[in-house]
Amino acid sequence: MIESTNFRAGIGGSFLRATPAALSQMPQRLYAPSRNTSISAPMHSQSLPRIVEKNRHEWLVQTRLFDLESIVDVEPQVNPRQWLLSGNPRLASLITQTIGDRWITHLEDLQQLVPMADHPLFQLRWRAVKQANKQVLANEIYQSQGIRINVNSLIDLQLQPIVGHQRQLLNILHIITLFNQIKQNPGLNILPRTFIFGDIATEHGAGLRSDCHEGHEYDHEQQETDSNSATLALIKSLAKIFAADPDVSGKLQVVYVPESAGLTNQMYAAADLTQQIATAAMEDIDLSQLRATINGVVSIGSLGKTNYWLQQIVGEQNCFRFGLAIPEIALFKEYGYDPYNYYKYYPQIRQAIDYLLAGYFTPDDPSVCRSIIDTLLGTDEQMVLADYIFYAACQHHVSDSYRQASSWTQMSIMNVAGVK
């Protein structure tokens, strides 16, 4: 176990330095830390107002994130029709066979899928398309990397640039927790998962931003750069370690697919779950995330602007949400946040970090993960440890839900039906 004096940075023995009275007096400005929100799709003038125009005031009060007057238009590369027609032709064909081809020019026609969402025969055909897409992806990965993926597993996709605020580390800590559970109990009936990481550029240049470097010294920026590089190295090492471990074979798999592999369409077509887990306070609205939605990929997401927007589209019962919202993150940072306490008091977090500290997953160079540990237990600006327990619980719910094939398929169909 790590000694607290190495990482505590002088903050007292609570997760948050604030009294109940102080919390009750939290200034309203914490509810709107970003006043300049990017809507990155030409459809914004149609889709977003449709969500809020009936009761705009109520929606803004609920989100406390932004108002329509503060939205800045930017030219995106968001084309849901093309993502489905060229990226997932099997699913596009099934949809056309079911509701006709008018949806190609009128996306709102996808709503005609709603009454079909719980139809057993249609669900069976939907799952057959997904399974065929999984096999295509598996073949491509095997040909390019020599890796065989389990096509009967839940394919869990995180396809974003590997940078701090996208929080691949949150995903990794949970993967290590699952690994530890299997090692502690090799007979554990765990849902098989294939975790696919891809380091790709966003669909548009302005959709995501990171404010975390402003006003910080170079050494802090260098620490984050080192941590990002170490995260990529750790992902690749996890893939090798898991592949060689008979205890996790067929249960857990990690795959890294570089952008150069050209498999973006295949990954979205095959995925069951997409991880949109960026730090809530660090993201602008990014409508390129509709690429997963229109492929019927269910999302697990943090409580940021994009994920709230998508939740309104697909319905809260058809996605998974967790963690701290923007005002809560702002509150933590204003009143003091000590990540070490999460390491100290939560065994799952401590066990996962101790694996990293021991160099278990990086045997060739145990020091690789040092910058990751420094980042997590030093300042943890991306609130990875603060969100971890919420995230792990939500992922457990994902596993339980995926075992119910009919209800999961219905969620997938409703995701597509919500795009308009």
Predicted feature residues:
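Catalytic cores of carbohydrate-active enzymes across secretory and cytosolic contexts
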Residues: 1-420
